[in-house]
């Protein structure tokens, strides 16, 4: 019989025993059980609901990773109640970034399977977390000093689209890493959200890299391949910015 020693208070004000999954109503705030040695002991855990979910349901053991994931989740949720798929997508993305920041990166596709969400939902979580991280970074830059330059990372969806784009220009894929770094840095410098949607900055960053290999490439000819993504004026404006800031 379970003594309900491991009580978790969630964000909805309800409580659940993490060991036997017995759910208590909203009026329940603490669980007192009798210790085998006699005295009554308060077994209410100080861990938050998010921490317990990451540890119990998803097997995250590193306390630093859990703390960072919880912080990112709270920034993203903005103290609002999030449920269902939306909650899982944000939590998945929060954990993805937490692993990345603690230098123990995990494959995003594997996390999607673990959290039982598809790529569309996962991409939404990534986008929401990036926005929240960016806002938090601006409000408290000191907290992000050790993560400087690591606000963004390419998920598998990003990588697939960038690989296709690189092939379009007949660029060997062994140059992928260099181009990805420029795109990430470009978005950081311009304070733009990086998601898996190809935008003008992706194109401009690729052209910026091409110019490091061949400075004689004609911008107008390059733009003619990408009229749906970028104009000549935009390319020139982006290049001016990138040359000055990268």
From Swiss-Prot:
CDD domains: CYCLIN_SF. SUPFAM superfamilies: Cyclin-like. InterPro entries: Cyclin-like_sf. Belongs to the IIV-6 359L family. This is Uncharacterized protein 105R.
């Amino acid at each position: 019989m379970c003594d309900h020693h491991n009580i978790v208070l969630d964000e909805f004000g309800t409580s659940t025993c993490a060991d036997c999954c017995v759910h208590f109503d909203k009026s329940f705030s603490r669980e007192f059980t009798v210790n085998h040695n006699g005295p009554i002991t308060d077994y209410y855990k100080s861990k938050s609901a998010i921490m317990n979910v990451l540890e119990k349901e998803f097997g995250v053991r590193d306390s630093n990773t859990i703390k960072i994931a919880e912080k990112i989740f709270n920034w993203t949720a903005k103290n609002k109640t999030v449920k269902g798929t939306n909650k899982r997508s944000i939590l998945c993305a929060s954990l993805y970034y937490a692993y990345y920041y603690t230098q123990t990166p995990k494959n995003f596709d594997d996390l999607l399977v673990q959290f039982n969400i598809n790529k569309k939902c996962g991409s939404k979580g990534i986008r929401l977390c990036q926005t929240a991280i960016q806002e938090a970074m601006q409000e408290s830059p000191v907290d992000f000093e050790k993560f400087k330059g690591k606000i963004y990372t390419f998920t598998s969806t990003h990588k697939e689209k960038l690989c296709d784009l690189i092939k379009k220009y007949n660029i060997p894929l062994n140059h992928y890493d260099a181009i990805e770094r420029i795109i990430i840095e470009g978005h950081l410098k311009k304070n733009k959200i990086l998601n898996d949607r190809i935008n003008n900055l992706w194109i401009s960053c690729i052209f910026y890299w091409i110019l490091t290999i061949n400075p004689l490439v004609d911008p107008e000819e390059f733009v003619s391949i990408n009229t749906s993504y970028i104009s000549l004026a935009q390319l020139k404006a982006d290049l001016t910015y990138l040359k000055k800031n990268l």
